[in-house]
Amino acid sequence: MAIGYPNGKKYAASQEELPQQKRKAPVTYGKRGMSLEDDLNDTIAYYLTHEIAVIHKKPTPVQIVSVDYPKRSSAKIKEAYFKTPSTTDYNGVYKGKYVDFEAKETQNTTSFPLSNFHDHQMTHMANVLKQDGIVFVIIAFQKLGETHFIPFEKFYPFWERMQSGGRKSVTIAEIQDVSDQIPYGLNPRLDFLQSIDKLYF
């Protein structure tokens, strides 16, 4: 319905009086608000609460260099550095077996760069494997929405190939050939124990 003035002119609202249309942000399906580490931490908390497995994330070692004591009851760290971690991110026990694994994520869609791993991590995982532990790598391709469970014995040949002058990355096709894809769920978020049951028990 048009509104008019008594003199016959039509009413036109100013820009300030018009309701502002809200601009909707474009919908993105990448990341979905959680990182691989968050997903794994939620998953292992679920396992612990339901007495399924005891797995913990190891804290990142920090070297404290300088501390200030402004009060007797408090301390303020003024300078600290990350130490190079000597082992993997996660370890624990499941069905009486020692479990040890490293988790990495990438934004790449075609390959995973092996530079994300370090020599000392590979040495540690190889040593755990020699002691008959369950050792594996979880790699998440965030943009693809895929998370892969790779037994260490199938992942290590890619590392050896790089060490002998070969490719410095693993293609997504190579990973899909040797891995078990972990489906996303509600609880637990990333049920990697399904992969352990399938491959080791």
Swiss-Prot record:
It holds the Pfam family RecU. InterPro entries: Resolv_RecU, Restrct_endonuc-II-like, tRNA_endonuc-like_dom_sf. Mg(2+) binds at residues 87, 89, 102, 121. GO terms for cellular component: cytoplasm. Keywords: Cytoplasm, DNA damage, DNA recombination, DNA repair, Endonuclease, Hydrolase, Magnesium, Metal-binding, Nuclease. Residues 1-26 are annotated as: Disordered. It is an enzyme of class 3 (hydrolase). Its cofactor is Mg(2+). Binds 1 Mg(2+) ion per subunit. The record marks 104 as: Transition state stabilizer. GO terms for biological process: chromosome segregation; DNA recombination; DNA repair. One of its GO terms (molecular function) is nucleic acid binding. It comes from the Bacteria. It catalyses: Endonucleolytic cleavage at a junction such as a reciprocal single-stranded crossover between two homologous DNA duplexes (Holliday junction). Belongs to the RecU family. Endonuclease that resolves Holliday junction intermediates in genetic recombination. Cleaves mobile four-strand junctions by introducing symmetrical nicks in paired strands. Promotes annealing of linear ssDNA with homologous dsDNA. Required for DNA repair, homologous recombination and chromosome segregation. This is Holliday junction resolvase RecU. The gene is recU.
